[in-house]
């Protein structure tokens, strides 16, 4: 299942003295089975797009097509609820997403809310908690007693338990140590390989290079560049002009080029750089 935004604009508190335009005529396509990254500086519109993807917000103008469901300014709650089941959104701050008495109840809540029996919901919860690396001895603990990294995993499991077609991730590894970040990114990559559509918002350009097949660059509420990461990251000057930059190895290759080394194109991963050196 994919998502298409057509000429989408959004203004917070529209029609009031406090209105704040956030998006302007955005066109964007997330293809079924893709791993799409959305990148942009603070205030670029990334978070607004994420909330539009799963119906937390509806566009003031334009449409958001999720599979066969079309969301516009006039959409009814029935359509929006279906979108929320298909598109799972993991917020950047997990404490805003967990709430129940125990870890197991928290993860089982979502499936039950969509009509799954208590027994089946608990089975799904156990499966997804194991998937994200939460051990059974934590199942009956309060989620608020967990570490930040564990709480993040519980929040992800609670979304996966609803078995969405699309997983939307807002800075999913923020605040994690390197090993925790690597493990979570591995889980997302496995989900993608199994056929799930992934949408990733991140400030880490190396993650975009290593995992995404498509990237959209946002600036001041508009899409200013899009394409494959290998294409987008060739324009180092532009990416730095909007305070994003490029992967570390791309920056390093650019510095080598300034010292006389020839590149037909700048590598975006370490593996690609090795191939160029040995090619």
UniProtKB/Swiss-Prot annotation:
Record's keyword annotation contains Transmembrane: no
Sequence ranges assigned to domain ABC transporter in this UniProt record: 3-245
Gene Ontology CC: ATP-binding cassette (ABC) transporter complex
Main location: membrane
Any GO MF annotation of the entry: ATP hydrolysis activity
Keywords linked to the UniProt accession: ATP-binding, Cell membrane, Membrane, Nucleotide-binding, Translocase, Transport
Database matches in Gene3D superfamilies: P-loop containing nucleotide triphosphate hydrolases
EC numbers, comma separated: 7.-.-.-
Compartments, record wording: Cell membrane
Taxonomic superkingdom: Bacteria
Binding site for ATP: 40-47
Family annotation (InterPro entries): AAA+_ATPase, ABC_transporter-like_ATP-bd, ABC_transporter-like_CS, ABC_transpr_CbiO/EcfA_su, ECF_ABC_transporter_ATP-bd, EcfA2, P-loop_NTPase
Mode of membrane association: Peripheral membrane protein
Record's function text: ATP-binding (A) component of a common energy-coupling factor (ECF) ABC-transporter complex. Unlike classic ABC transporters this ECF transporter provides the energy necessary to transport a number of different substrates.
Family: Belongs to the ABC transporter superfamily. Energy-coupling factor EcfA family.
Subunit structure: Forms a stable energy-coupling factor (ECF) transporter complex composed of 2 membrane-embedded substrate-binding proteins (S component), 2 ATP-binding proteins (A component) and 2 transmembrane proteins (T component).
Name of this protein: Energy-coupling factor transporter ATP-binding protein EcfA2
Origin species: Streptococcus sanguinis (strain SK36)
């Amino acid at each position: 299942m994919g998502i298409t935004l057509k000429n989408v604009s959004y203004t917070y508190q529209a029609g009031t003295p406090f209105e704040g335009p956030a998006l302007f005529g955005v066109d964007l396509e997330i293809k079924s089975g893709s791993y799409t990254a959305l990148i942009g500086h603070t205030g670029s519109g990334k978070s607004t797009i994420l909330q539009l993807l799963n119906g937390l917000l509806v566009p003031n103008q334009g449409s958001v097509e999720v599979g066969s469901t079309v969301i516009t300014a006039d959409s009814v709650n029935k359509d929006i609820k279906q979108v929320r089941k298909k598109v799972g959104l993991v917020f950047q701050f997990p404490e805003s997403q967990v709430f129940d008495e125990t870890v197991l109840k928290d993860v089982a809540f979502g499936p039950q809310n969509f009509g799954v029996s208590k027994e089946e919901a608990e089975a799904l919860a156990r499966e997804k908690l194991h998937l994200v690396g939460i051990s059974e001895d934590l199942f009956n603990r309060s989620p608020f007693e967990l570490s930040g990294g564990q709480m993040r995993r519980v929040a992800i499991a609670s979304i996966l338990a609803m078995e969405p077609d699309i997983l939307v991730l807002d800075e999913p590894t923020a605040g994690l140590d390197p090993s925790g970040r690597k493990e979570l990114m591995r889980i997302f990559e496995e989900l993608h390989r199994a056929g799930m559509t992934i949408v990733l918002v991140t400030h880490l350009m190396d993650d975009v290079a290593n995992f995404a097949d498509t990237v959209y660059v946002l600036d001041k509420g508009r899409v200013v560049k899009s394409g494959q990461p290998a294409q987008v990251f060739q324009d180092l000057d532009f990416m730095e002009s909007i305070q994003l930059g490029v992967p570390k190895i791309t920056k390093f290759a650019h510095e080598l080029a300034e010292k006389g080394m020839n590149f037909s194109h700048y590598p975006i991963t370490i593996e690609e750089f090795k191939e160029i050196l040995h090619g």
